[in-house]
């Protein structure tokens, strides 16, 4: 019985190492788009979206991992030609009105 407990304990110890959250940032999280007009549109939109982790910073200013993922998503969609209003609507639909500094009335 003690041997079984030791074996189970040995398998449980490495789990925190697997749960390490040191993934690299999303590809476009900290990289600007090559087209200056698209980057300006993305930046303008990112400044109006609230970071869900920092609660007071926009995703443009936040260093949180979630904000980086959201910046990458905004840049990817802008680069694909999606209008900022559609991206904002998608983010509000996914995260709720609180994500926007200018929620719909």
Where are these regions (language model features)?
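Membrane-proximal low-complexity regions enriched in glycine and acidic/polar residues
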Residues: 17-57
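Juxtamembrane/start-of-transmembrane alpha-helix segments at the extracytoplasmic/lumenal side
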Residues: 101-105
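N-terminal, post-signal-peptide region of Sec/Tat-exported proteins
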Residues: 46-76, 80
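Extended, hydrophilic extramembrane loops/domains of integral membrane proteins
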Residues: 70-99
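Residue-level marker of intrinsically disordered, low-complexity segments enriched
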Residues: 4-6, 13, 51, 57, ...
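Hydrophobic secretory-pathway targeting helix
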Residues: 1-22
